[in-house]
Amino acid sequence: MDLFSSLPFYVQPDPLQNSPAPQQSSGTDDTASQSGPAISCHSGPAAASNDQLVKLVSGIFNESFGFRPDGKPYRLGLKSVTERLTATDYLFVAGDDHSGIGYLFGKEIPSSYGRIAWVESMAVLPLYRRRGIATALVSAFARATKAAPRLGFATPNPIAALIATRIMPGKMYIGPCSPPYALRRLLKEIRQDCFDLRGCHIDEGNMTIKTGFSPLSRSDQREWNPRRPVAEPSWWKFVEHLPNEFEALLIIET
């Protein structure tokens, strides 16, 4: 089941614990330390031309998202991965480039309201979840795009949103929050350059999009279940109980 389980790694805090986000060293290649896994950074176009990285991203995705409502497994083939990486700015891989355990790719999207750093896809192999891998990946992306005044992504999983809010300081928009006019216009303006938003209905008032992405395994870990007593975020229940065909939008303005 787990194609990459032989890779050693270093444990980071669980994002549901009441602890600060881990800090990583700067640079394009973070070596492994006791605080987390090694995170390598590649430009999207360079990664798209690297057969090993394309296979790695496809393999991690295919092991991570379970099944469609019709019972067929979610798959991201080599051709689709190549196309997605060609059109993005950064690929981050947790572990090494031959036997990684997680990835994130994303890009900065310009608009007349300023740039936004958008996480286009992130996945961590099931065996390695709740070990800080996603936190390390989002941290690396946030450092690489720190000049952008906003971070955004679409997700069906409240844990992903929690990770981002613990890493990025700033004003958060998620759930029924009545975002300002400028933010609504930004979403409309970037939608053709954003894979998540292209062709989707955007409910700006509730910060959701209706997509065809509804993996049945998404309910594996969506309940608020911290290891230490800590208050549940006000938006958590809204994201936890979204219908399967919807994803939440999160934007953080720094």
What are these regions (language model features)?
Residues 2-54, 63-64, 85, 146-254:
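Terminal substrate-recognition subdomain of acyl/acetyltransferases
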Residues 46-50, 112, 118, 122, ...:
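Amphipathic alpha-helical protein-protein interaction segments
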Residues 57-122:
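A conserved beta-strand-loop-helix scaffold within acyl/acetyltransferase catalytic domains
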Residues 99-102, 109-115, 125-131, 159-163, ...:
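Eukaryotic short linear interaction motifs
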Residues 124, 130-143:
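Conserved acetyl-CoA-binding loop-helix of GNAT-fold acetyltransferases
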